[in-house]
């Protein structure tokens, strides 16, 4: 978990009676198996952070629990979403929606909190949820690092030269 995730938790705690955080690294969101294998995993540390934040529930499902026989690994998306990130990460949004669908069918939560950093993903999820669930999708402000980059689990994979280039656009 990073400060962006912590901000989402705190936003939830401000407006909800109970807070549930799910931690699931979704293999269907990754185009390359090496990206999935190299994705940062810090479960023990993350749970300690969530305990400190006094989160009510932490859900850490395994792949079999998410992808049971009746759960699709991907949910088709309209081609209008296959631009920007959707163009360069084929299958990513379809995998995201499959897990969102599973969670919301199972958990029946009133709200989910997403960061504006992933605006295209937020927009897609918001429209998907609006058509199928009574859950409100809450958009939360992007939290930035000292380098002005938004916090992201993938930032560990970015070299200094790339950070300097990215700073010109933030």
How should each PLM-predicted stretch be described?
Residues 1-170:
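Nucleotidyltransferase catalytic core that binds NTPs
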């Amino acid at each position: 978990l990073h400060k962006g995730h912590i901000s989402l938790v705190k936003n939830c705690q401000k407006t909800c009676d109970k807070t549930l955080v799910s931690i699931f690294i979704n293999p269907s969101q990754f185009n390359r198996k090496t990206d999935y294998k190299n994705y940062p995993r810090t479960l023990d540390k993350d749970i300690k952070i969530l305990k400190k934040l006094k989160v009510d529930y932490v859900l850490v499902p395994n792949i079999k629990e998410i992808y049971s026989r009746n759960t699709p690994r991907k949910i088709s998306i309209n081609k209008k979403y296959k631009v920007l990130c959707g163009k360069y990460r084929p299958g990513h949004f379809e995998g995201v929606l499959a897990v969102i669908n599973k969670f919301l069918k199972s958990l029946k939560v009133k709200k989910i909190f997403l960061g504006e950093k992933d605006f295209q993903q937020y927009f897609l999820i918001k429209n998907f949820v609006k058509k199928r669930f009574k859950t409100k999708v809450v958009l939360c402000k992007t939290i930035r690092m000292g380098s002005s980059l938004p916090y992201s689990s993938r930032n560990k994979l970015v070299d200094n030269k790339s950070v300097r280039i990215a700073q010109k656009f933030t």
